[in-house]
Amino acid sequence: MRGGRAVCFAWLALTAVPTDRLSAQEVAPNRATTYLHPTDVRDPRALWVNPAGLAVRRDASVYAELAVSDPGRGAGRLRQVSAGFNARGLAFGYQRDLFDSGRRGHTYRLGLAGGSEGLAVGAAMALYRGGTKGTGWDLGGSYVVAPALTVGGVIANIGQPVVRSLQQRVTFIPGATWRPLGPAATLSIHARIRTDVLGYAFGVSWQGVGRVPMGVLARLDTDGGLRRGAFAIGFSVGGPDRVGVVVSAPGDLSGPDAASLWGLSTREAGRSRH
């Protein structure tokens, strides 16, 4: 039993944040997956989190993000650069990872999504390059059950590609988002389920309005026994043109081990479907 718990906690630590441990194994999840949820993402970052989110809004948007490890130790070290765009459900993204060995990882991601009357579905194809060749697929969906409640999920790593000698196993990620005070405030939860491990993520966010809108988010990741594995907190400022910063720490809150700076520009073409 203890061995199973140890395996689960180790997997959560690996997938939670792109730290030095990730670099040593030369595989890293996209930074957005460490602080967003599959039922509450509505911009190009949905390409990495839940491709169905690409169809929630009828807009054209672009984003970019820089992530560093160990920001509390001097200037930190650049680990990941990612960027992408979404044009009404058609999206493309690129991720570049810098590993300790000096090797560079490249991930190209293409997504397509559509939706109607609260239902959105999407698919994304990932091409892995940089010392490896692999192809994987994600399928995602979301549905507005009630004005304040959205449910959805993702089947990730279909095809189980091998990326730099590490197989990416099929993962089921169900989730839900509740908006008790309207669209400004959200409470989200999702799980990551594989045949051998289980983890949860709980998050809250708030997005203000006005001349200079400000936003805040927080997320806690746990293992299947609800023991803390990682924590993230973020702040943003702006409306259609927005910038933000996210800082992550291990579950014991011993200090920041990753941070990222992101920018997003959106041009809305119509009402959102959610």
Short names for language-model regions:
Residues 1-30, 254-258, 266-274:
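Cleavable N-terminal export/targeting peptides
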Residues 32, 37-40, 65-69, 95-99, ...:
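Outer-membrane beta-barrel pore domains and translocons
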Residues 57-61, 87-89, 114-120, 146-148, ...:
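Strand-connecting loop/turn motifs
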Residues 152, 162-274:
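Outer membrane beta-barrel transmembrane domains
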